[in-house]
Amino acid sequence: MPSLAPDCPLLAMPEETQEDSVAPMMPSQRSRGPLAPNHVHEVCLHQVESISDLHSGAGTLRPYLTEEARPWDELLGVLPPSLCAQAGCSPVYRRGGFLLLLALLVLTCLVLALLAVYLSVLQSESLRILAHTLRTQEETLLKLRLASLSQLRRLNSSEAQAPS
């Protein structure tokens, strides 16, 4: 279980949070082996009045947000070492690998944007062709109706002239 930092005041949790966080252990959970070590060494809970306090640093968070910016290696150190060992990377290649992944992500986004534009143009072109086809069919149907009415009139007039 992570330890609380010595400079973090222990805050009382609301009843709803306590109910959610305290759950009885199931028998299957007790029989599990030891959990993998967590890379979070300290947990520091700070009371905030609203979500905007987290972004602006206002309110009771002000003393805790004055820490210096963390170096790049410390930020990348959040990844478990076992993950880097499996991938075969060393701390020297972390930043380069991260930048390579970032470049790959940007390139993928550009390709997807181009594909979206291409599909949009293709869709508008096919809709234009479909509209033209429907107009042509509508004109043909109108011509067939006129021809049918003309034939019906001729038939009616020839029956009226025929002697019975």
Curated annotation (Swiss-Prot):
Localization, UniProt: Membrane
Keyword terms: Membrane, Transmembrane, Transmembrane helix
Membrane topology summary: Single-pass membrane protein
Keyword flag Transmembrane helix: yes
Keyword Transmembrane assigned: yes
Main localization category: membrane
Superkingdom of origin: Eukaryota
Family annotation (InterPro entries): DUF4714
Transmembrane feature ranges: 97-117
GO cellular component terms attached to this protein's record: membrane
Name of the protein this chain belongs to: Leucine-rich single-pass membrane protein 2
